[in-house]
Each structure stands twice: as C-alpha cells, then as structure tokens.
C-alpha cells in the first residue's frame, strides 16, 4: 500500500520541519515570548508543510513545558492533543465551504477550551470558502475571544 510521505512521517517539533527555518524560527520566537497572534495565514504550494506547521503551532501554544519554542510532547496538553483533544479543530474548507458550516464554527468559538489553554481552529484550503462563508467568518477572525487562535492555510493568495 502506498502512503504519502506526509502521512507516514509528520514532524513532531518545529526543528524537524524541513526547508522552512525562517517560518519555524518566527513561530518558535512567538512561543518563547508568550505572544502568539490571534490569527495566522500559511500559504504555499502543496506539500510545503502548512498543515504540519499549523498542527505544531496548535500544540506549541498549548504546551505546558515548551522546549525552545517546541512542544514538549510529554505534558498533559501535548498528550491530549496527540490523542485528539476537542480544543484543536481542523476544518477542511474544500468540503465544508458553505455559510452554514462557518456559522456553526462561529457559534462554537464562544465556548472556552475544555483541556487546553487555547482553542485552535485550523482551516485548511481556506480559499475554497464561498464568499458568503468567508464574510460570515471575517468578524470572528478579526476579533476573536482571547482563548481562540485561527490558522488559515491555503495554496492560493
């Protein structure tokens, strides 16, 4: 059976991400300083590590004992995220691109995280959202509650 490399191997730390040092250094510095932004936009071709960096960032901002900006992988939060913590929400905008999908997400944003410090919404292929869906999401992205971080990933600008 053929497995894509990104499915077989996904970096566990920012240091393991290949050819994105300028990005991973910036993200690690934000973790070390304790100043994560409320929203990020990751752009690039397929296979450049957008989703990997988004998942690492979700883990790192919630890690209780980060190591040089990397998630430790051993604390309660890291283990919960690895096990599928409900505070890390990944949405494939290619499949969930309607205004009703975004409204459901927007309603969910107001609830505090259950396990982690932050709820992180990773919206992959964000360019696939309909214009109505993106308009419904815009205000929430611009002014999210303090416990929410959005990471948008796209292959198009």
Placement of each model-derived feature along the sequence:
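P-loop/Walker A NTP-binding region and its immediately flanking N-terminal helices
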Residues: 1-157
């Amino acid at each position: 059976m053929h497995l894509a490399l990104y499915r077989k191997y996904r970096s566990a730390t920012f240091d393991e991400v290949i050819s994105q040092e300028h990005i991973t250094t910036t993200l690690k510095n934000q973790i070390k300083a304790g100043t994560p932004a409320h929203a990020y936009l990751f752009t690039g071709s397929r296979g450049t590590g957008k989703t990997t960096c988004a998942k690492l960032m979700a883990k790192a901002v919630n890690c209780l004992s980060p190591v040089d900006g990397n998630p430790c992988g051993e604390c309660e939060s890291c283990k919960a995220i690895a096990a599928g913590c409900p505070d890390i929400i990944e949405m494939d905008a290619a499949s969930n691109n309607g205004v009703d999908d975004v409204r459901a997400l927007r309603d969910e944003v107001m609830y505090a995280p259950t396990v982690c410090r932050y709820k992180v919404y990773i919206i992959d292929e964000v360019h696939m959202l309909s214009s109505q869906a993106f308009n419904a999401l815009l205000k929430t992205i611009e002014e999210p509650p303090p416990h929410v971080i959005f990471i948008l990933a796209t292959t198009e600008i």
